[in-house]
From Swiss-Prot:
SUPFAM superfamilies: Carbamate kinase-like. This is Uridylate kinase. Keywords: Allosteric enzyme, ATP-binding, Cytoplasm, Kinase, Nucleotide-binding, Pyrimidine biosynthesis, Transferase. It catalyses: UMP + ATP = UDP + ADP. The lineage of its organism: Bacteria, Pseudomonadati, Pseudomonadota, Gammaproteobacteria, Vibrionales.
């Protein structure tokens, strides 16, 4: 395997699930996991890659149970958005402790806590080598953080959306329940839809497809995987318009 001397991506949008931050814990934020992820992002900054981040909120708030109990979906989604802001603040703090400049931008105004999302400002920050953490999803209920990741990725003209998961990429079947499941190296948008593979929700996926935004799914729990993806090594599954 030949290693490229420099990164194949100049600007990326990294999507982290909230659950990824909880480590082995069942809830909340695991400090060691948070620091490890901050170090992996720091490596990319040192390579000259511009990094935007979207983090989910599932480690702090899960609306499904409350929705079943009768909570209004809009209220639940607003609570979920605030959970992503909390994760964003934690990630910014971890990056600052690793001597990496980072800004948190929120799609809903939270004066005194973080910056309001502003497209031009986000681009300027990225160009200055700062990590920009986009929080509060899209700012609208009924949209997932995967949708927010694809939307922000398209807006900042990222080269790729990197979706960090607990498995090595996209498989023919669930690798947890089916040990014979095979890992796909590359997929087209159409084949993902045809095979009904669960990469992300349909709204997010079709947004990426319609704007020709490549998605790479990889395992963030694998040390060095993020760097390997950015350096163009074989890691995870690439989804693009190429058949």
């Amino acid at each position: 395997m030949t290693t490229n001397p420099k990164p194949v991506y100049q600007r990326i949008l990294l999507k982290l699930s909230g659950e990824a931050l909880q480590g082995e814990e069942g809830f909340g934020i695991d400090p060691a996991t948070l620091d490890r992820m901050a170090q992996e992002v720091k490596e990319l900054i040192e390579l000259g890659v511009q990094v935007g981040v979207v983090i989910g909120g599932g480690n702090l708030f899960r609306g499904a149970g409350l929705a079943e109990a009768g909570m209004n979906r809009v209220v639940g989604d607003h609570m979920g958005m605030l959970a992503t802001v909390m994760n964003g603040l934690a990630m910014r703090d971890a990056l600052h402790r690793a001597y990496v400049n980072a800004r948190v931008m929120s799609a809903i105004p939270l004066k005194g806590v973080c910056d309001d999302y502003n497209w031009a400002d986000a681009i300027a920050q990225l160009r200055q080598g700062r990590v920009v953490i986009f929080s509060a999803g899209t700012g609208n209920p009924f949209f997932t953080t995967d949708s927010a990741a694809c939307l922000r990725g398209i807006e900042i003209e990222a080269d790729v959306v990197l979706k960090a998961t607990k498995v090595d990429g996209v498989f023919t079947a669930d690798p947890v329940s089916n040990p014979d499941a095979e890992l796909y190296d590359k997929l087209s948008y159409s084949s993902v839809l045809e095979k009904e593979l669960k990469v992300m929700d349909l709204a997010a996926f079709t947004l990426a497809r319609d704007h020709n935004m490549p998605i790479r799914v990889f395992n963030m729990n694998k040390p060095g995987a993020l760097r390997r993806v950015v350096m163009g090594e074989t890691e995870g599954t690439l989804i693009s318009n190429a058949e």
